[in-house]
């Protein structure tokens, strides 16, 4: 049975194969992991159990796996690594205080390309700066979590300078809020809930939408920070665009 399933999956490239409960019981080398069942002799293939039907999928096509399956495996890997990290005391090089040594806060994008590139390109080490990230590195609300975090950094942690850093090839540039709402409905969000939120005056399309120009977005964010009624005097605020490949920085002129 395992062999037959193996060949069917290999021939199809990627395919859901429903197996009834009786056939499932006949499969040897099976081990259960929570709500999942895994083929011990074929680690690339595993079964997902649901309503007395079992679906076999290939791990080489991760994008096609059910999100729940991917998350379970990913979290297991993370927890395993974390345990080893602590046991080996690999945390010791990162020991520092909560106060940024450079008295610097950076507002930037959550783009994965910047995770290691940005601090490396700026010479920022653990403990040097407060780094605040969101989609696009922008302020979507004058009294939202980004502004609050920056004020906490200034008032409680000694931040004296803020760098706003956008980057080239940003995924938020040109993002369509209307399309995102359609996708939310496809992903199971109730249209009724969306309509209720809109009825309160919330512009969800604008909230979910992106910007047309990275440079203009950085200018607008710097301007919003400098003219925010709660921004203390004496805080230096500057804007930059980072090359998402080389890490090179280009200063952005202040909005007039």
Regions found by a protein language model. Name each.
Residues 88, 93-147:
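Conserved beta-strand-loop surface patch within small alpha/beta domains used
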Residues 155-167:
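Ordered, amphipathic secondary-structure segments that act as subunit-interaction surfaces
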Residues 59-73:
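Short, Lys/Arg-enriched N-terminal segments with co-localized hydrophobic residues
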Residues 72-102, 137-142, 157, 172-256:
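Divalent-metal-activated hydrolytic enzyme cores
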Residues 106, 164, 247:
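Divalent metal-coordination and catalytic microenvironments
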Residues 8, 42:
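Short polybasic linear motifs
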């Amino acid at each position: 049975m395992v062999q037959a399933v193996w060949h069917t999956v290999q021939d199809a490239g990627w395919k859901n194969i429903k197996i009834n409960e009786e056939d499932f019981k006949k499969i040897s080398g099976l081990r259960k992991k929570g709500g999942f069942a895994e083929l011990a002799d074929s680690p690339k293939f595993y079964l997902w159990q649901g309503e007395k039907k079992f679906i076999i999928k290939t791990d080489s096509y991760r994008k096609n796996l059910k999100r729940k399956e991917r998350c379970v495996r990913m979290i297991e890997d993370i927890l395993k690594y974390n345990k080893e990290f602590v046991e080996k005391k690999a945390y010791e090089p990162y020991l520092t205080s909560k106060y940024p040594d450079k008295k610097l806060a950076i507002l930037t994008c959550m783009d994965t390309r910047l995770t290691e590139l940005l601090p490396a390109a700026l010479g920022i080490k653990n403990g040097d700066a407060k780094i605040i990230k969101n989609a696009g590195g922008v302020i979507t609300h004058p009294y939202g979590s980004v502004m609050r975090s920056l004020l906490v950094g200034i008032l409680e942690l000694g931040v004296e300078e803020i760098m706003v850093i956008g980057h080239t090839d940003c995924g938020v540039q040109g993002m369509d809020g209307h399309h995102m709402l359609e996708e939310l409905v496809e992903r199971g969000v109730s249209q009724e809930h969306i309509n209720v939120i809109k009825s309160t005056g919330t512009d969800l399309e604008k909230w979910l939408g992106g910007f047309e120009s990275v440079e203009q977005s950085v200018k607008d964010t710097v301007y919003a920070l400098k003219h925010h009624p709660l921004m203390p005097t004496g805080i230096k605020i500057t804007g930059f665009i980072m090359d998402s490949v080389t890490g090179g920085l280009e200063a952005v002129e202040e909005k007039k």
